[in-house]
């Protein structure tokens, strides 16, 4: 298992600065955020460390060589939109960019794209499963033809009132995953234990059942404020009663989680996803949070 970093937390860094910092900190890999250049639609989105819309083969070779010179692997090309958005233009733009990422990932020899499945928040799960098959069948045909794995993060994307009532990502439960995996052998999970923890689910059980579909891993923690949960209730906006935290500062049992990853012989990349407002006051705060997270997770990975 290789410990890495999700690049979204360092939006002001160039690709070179990002890879240099990752190497200095002791990371073995980085998930590179590849959003289209433009205004961010939410926190930690809209980050572009590789602009695939302005990249030729020479530029691809440059990125690969620079990463190699740093001794840091590019674990995947990451982009987390809603390709099943109820607005057709928004959905189509997301789908098209995912396909571009698949093509770039194949050409660069990365063969991994990390993203969201998407969801129409106003439709039922069953209706969304039908929509998923319609939208994702052609996308996965491209991925299969190019030998690229697509790792879907298991985040419900249901935190605030603008994501109400159903959330913006369908792929948050085993019930959905079983049907999702029927579509393609190249479709798997970018598994983050903080999401099932938030949903009150067992965080390690899915690793054993879906061991062959754990393509990529995120390390992120969650802190639940019980007083606020008592006030608002479980069916309120989750942002009212929980906070994303650095690994080790919330409720996720990372010793047990990494132990389960070892049990299933997971040998891929596991990237720390730093999302913690307590460590975002300045770039020094951000770096401190990253480095603390690296030290904390290294004790479990033997780095």
Enumerate the predicted regions with their spans.
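Histidine-acidic metal/acid-base catalytic patches
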Residues: 1-29, 34-36, 68, 109, ...
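A short, structure-level motif marking secondary-structure boundaries and short turns
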Residues: 2-5, 47-49, 85-87, 123-125, ...
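Charged, low-complexity surface patches
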Residues: 11, 56, 94, 132, ...
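Active-site acidic/histidine proton-transfer and metal-coordination neighborhood
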Residues: 17, 61-73, 83-191, 198-199, ...
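Short, well-structured secondary-structure segments
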Residues: 28-34, 73-78, 111-115
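Glycine-rich, proline-tolerant flexible connector loops at the mouths of alpha/beta enzymes
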Residues: 33-62, 123
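Positions that flank functional sites
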Residues: 37-38, 81-82, 120-121, 158, ...
